[in-house]
A protein has these predicted regions:
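Membrane-embedded alpha-helical bundles that constitute the cytochrome b-like, heme-associated redox core
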Residues: 1-169
Length: 169
Protein backbone atom coordinates (compact mmCIF):
# COMPACT_ATOMS: atom_id res chain seq x y z
CA UNK A 1 0.00 0.00 0.00
CA UNK A 2 1.13 3.60 -0.48
CA UNK A 3 1.17 4.16 3.30
CA UNK A 4 3.54 1.25 3.87
CA UNK A 5 5.77 2.35 0.98
CA UNK A 6 5.88 5.93 2.24
CA UNK A 7 6.63 4.73 5.79
CA UNK A 8 9.51 2.67 4.47
CA UNK A 9 10.70 5.64 2.40
CA UNK A 10 10.61 7.94 5.44
CA UNK A 11 12.62 5.41 7.44
CA UNK A 12 15.19 5.08 4.64
CA UNK A 13 15.44 8.86 4.25
CA UNK A 14 15.62 9.81 7.94
CA UNK A 15 18.20 7.13 8.70
CA UNK A 16 20.17 8.08 5.55
CA UNK A 17 20.06 4.43 4.47
CA UNK A 18 18.95 5.49 0.99
CA UNK A 19 21.83 7.93 0.59
CA UNK A 20 24.45 5.64 2.16
CA UNK A 21 23.00 2.20 1.48
CA UNK A 22 22.41 2.81 -2.24
CA UNK A 23 26.07 3.48 -3.07
CA UNK A 24 27.16 0.64 -0.76
CA UNK A 25 24.81 -1.78 -2.55
CA UNK A 26 26.17 -0.60 -5.90
CA UNK A 27 29.78 -1.07 -4.73
CA UNK A 28 29.09 -4.54 -3.30
CA UNK A 29 27.39 -5.54 -6.54
CA UNK A 30 30.33 -4.32 -8.63
CA UNK A 31 32.82 -6.03 -6.29
CA UNK A 32 30.85 -9.29 -6.51
CA UNK A 33 30.90 -9.03 -10.30
CA UNK A 34 34.65 -8.32 -10.40
CA UNK A 35 35.44 -11.28 -8.12
CA UNK A 36 33.20 -13.63 -10.11
CA UNK A 37 34.33 -12.25 -13.49
CA UNK A 38 37.80 -13.69 -13.00
CA UNK A 39 36.38 -17.02 -14.17
CA UNK A 40 34.12 -15.72 -16.94
CA UNK A 41 34.96 -16.29 -20.63
CA UNK A 42 35.14 -12.76 -22.06
CA UNK A 43 37.14 -13.12 -25.27
CA UNK A 44 35.44 -14.65 -28.31
CA UNK A 45 38.02 -17.46 -28.31
CA UNK A 46 37.35 -18.32 -24.65
CA UNK A 47 33.59 -18.17 -25.16
CA UNK A 48 33.75 -20.39 -28.25
CA UNK A 49 35.89 -22.95 -26.38
CA UNK A 50 33.55 -22.88 -23.38
CA UNK A 51 30.53 -23.35 -25.64
CA UNK A 52 32.21 -26.27 -27.45
CA UNK A 53 33.08 -28.03 -24.20
CA UNK A 54 29.64 -27.40 -22.69
CA UNK A 55 27.95 -29.01 -25.70
CA UNK A 56 30.39 -31.92 -25.60
CA UNK A 57 29.95 -32.61 -21.86
CA UNK A 58 26.13 -32.39 -21.64
CA UNK A 59 26.51 -31.34 -18.00
CA UNK A 60 23.64 -29.36 -16.43
CA UNK A 61 25.87 -27.52 -13.95
CA UNK A 62 27.99 -26.16 -16.81
CA UNK A 63 24.92 -24.77 -18.53
CA UNK A 64 23.64 -23.34 -15.24
CA UNK A 65 26.94 -21.54 -14.81
CA UNK A 66 26.59 -20.05 -18.30
CA UNK A 67 23.05 -18.87 -17.44
CA UNK A 68 24.42 -17.37 -14.22
CA UNK A 69 27.11 -15.50 -16.18
CA UNK A 70 24.50 -14.12 -18.60
CA UNK A 71 22.16 -13.06 -15.80
CA UNK A 72 25.09 -11.44 -13.96
CA UNK A 73 25.76 -9.16 -16.91
CA UNK A 74 22.06 -8.29 -17.23
CA UNK A 75 21.83 -7.58 -13.48
CA UNK A 76 25.00 -5.49 -13.43
CA UNK A 77 23.71 -3.19 -16.16
CA UNK A 78 20.06 -3.02 -15.11
CA UNK A 79 20.51 -2.88 -11.31
CA UNK A 80 23.16 -0.18 -11.73
CA UNK A 81 20.70 1.84 -13.79
CA UNK A 82 18.00 1.24 -11.15
CA UNK A 83 20.21 2.31 -8.22
CA UNK A 84 21.50 5.38 -10.08
CA UNK A 85 17.92 6.32 -10.98
CA UNK A 86 16.83 6.00 -7.34
CA UNK A 87 19.79 7.98 -6.03
CA UNK A 88 19.30 10.76 -8.56
CA UNK A 89 15.60 11.12 -7.67
CA UNK A 90 15.69 11.28 -3.88
CA UNK A 91 13.65 11.42 -1.70
CA UNK A 92 11.98 8.06 -2.28
CA UNK A 93 8.17 8.03 -2.29
CA UNK A 94 5.29 5.78 -3.31
CA UNK A 95 4.18 8.40 -5.84
CA UNK A 96 7.55 8.39 -7.61
CA UNK A 97 7.65 4.60 -7.67
CA UNK A 98 4.11 4.43 -9.03
CA UNK A 99 4.90 7.08 -11.65
CA UNK A 100 7.85 5.02 -12.85
CA UNK A 101 5.79 1.84 -13.11
CA UNK A 102 2.89 3.62 -14.78
CA UNK A 103 5.34 5.43 -17.06
CA UNK A 104 6.42 2.25 -18.81
CA UNK A 105 9.10 0.74 -16.57
CA UNK A 106 7.26 -2.59 -16.08
CA UNK A 107 9.17 -4.42 -18.87
CA UNK A 108 12.49 -3.18 -17.42
CA UNK A 109 11.64 -4.51 -13.96
CA UNK A 110 10.22 -7.80 -15.28
CA UNK A 111 13.53 -8.51 -17.04
CA UNK A 112 15.56 -7.37 -14.01
CA UNK A 113 13.58 -9.50 -11.53
CA UNK A 114 13.59 -12.55 -13.82
CA UNK A 115 17.38 -12.27 -14.09
CA UNK A 116 17.67 -11.78 -10.32
CA UNK A 117 15.48 -14.80 -9.57
CA UNK A 118 17.46 -17.06 -11.89
CA UNK A 119 20.82 -15.74 -10.66
CA UNK A 120 19.91 -16.19 -6.99
CA UNK A 121 18.43 -19.67 -7.45
CA UNK A 122 21.39 -20.91 -9.49
CA UNK A 123 23.84 -19.28 -7.09
CA UNK A 124 22.25 -20.93 -4.07
CA UNK A 125 22.30 -24.27 -5.88
CA UNK A 126 26.00 -23.89 -6.76
CA UNK A 127 26.93 -22.88 -3.20
CA UNK A 128 24.98 -25.87 -1.88
CA UNK A 129 26.85 -28.23 -4.19
CA UNK A 130 30.21 -26.62 -3.39
CA UNK A 131 29.81 -26.98 0.37
CA UNK A 132 28.20 -30.42 0.29
CA UNK A 133 24.72 -29.33 1.36
CA UNK A 134 23.31 -30.67 -1.91
CA UNK A 135 23.97 -34.24 -2.98
CA UNK A 136 22.33 -36.82 -5.21
CA UNK A 137 19.90 -37.89 -2.48
CA UNK A 138 18.48 -34.46 -1.62
CA UNK A 139 19.00 -32.55 -4.89
CA UNK A 140 15.37 -32.86 -6.03
CA UNK A 141 14.10 -31.67 -2.66
CA UNK A 142 16.34 -28.58 -2.81
CA UNK A 143 15.40 -27.96 -6.44
CA UNK A 144 11.79 -27.84 -5.27
CA UNK A 145 12.73 -25.31 -2.56
CA UNK A 146 14.56 -23.18 -5.15
CA UNK A 147 11.47 -23.28 -7.36
CA UNK A 148 9.32 -22.15 -4.42
CA UNK A 149 11.77 -19.31 -3.75
CA UNK A 150 11.64 -18.17 -7.37
CA UNK A 151 7.84 -18.38 -7.48
CA UNK A 152 7.54 -16.56 -4.14
CA UNK A 153 9.84 -13.73 -5.23
CA UNK A 154 8.01 -13.47 -8.55
CA UNK A 155 4.61 -13.27 -6.85
CA UNK A 156 5.87 -10.66 -4.37
CA UNK A 157 7.29 -8.62 -7.23
CA UNK A 158 4.10 -8.89 -9.28
CA UNK A 159 1.96 -7.87 -6.30
CA UNK A 160 4.17 -4.85 -5.63
CA UNK A 161 4.15 -3.80 -9.28
CA UNK A 162 0.39 -4.31 -9.51
CA UNK A 163 -0.15 -2.05 -6.49
CA UNK A 164 2.03 0.65 -8.08
CA UNK A 165 0.37 0.21 -11.48
CA UNK A 166 -3.10 0.73 -10.02
CA UNK A 167 -2.18 3.47 -7.52
CA UNK A 168 -3.60 6.93 -8.13
CA UNK A 169 -0.81 9.50 -8.44
Amino acid sequence: SPKIMDSLAVFLETSYLAQIGGPIILLVMILHFILAARKMPFSPLELREFWRQAKMMHHMDTWLWLVQVATAIVILVMASAHVINILSNLPISADKSAAGIQGGMVPFYLVLFAALDLHIAIGLYRVGVKFGILNRENRLKWRKYALYLVIGLALLSLATHYSFATMAI
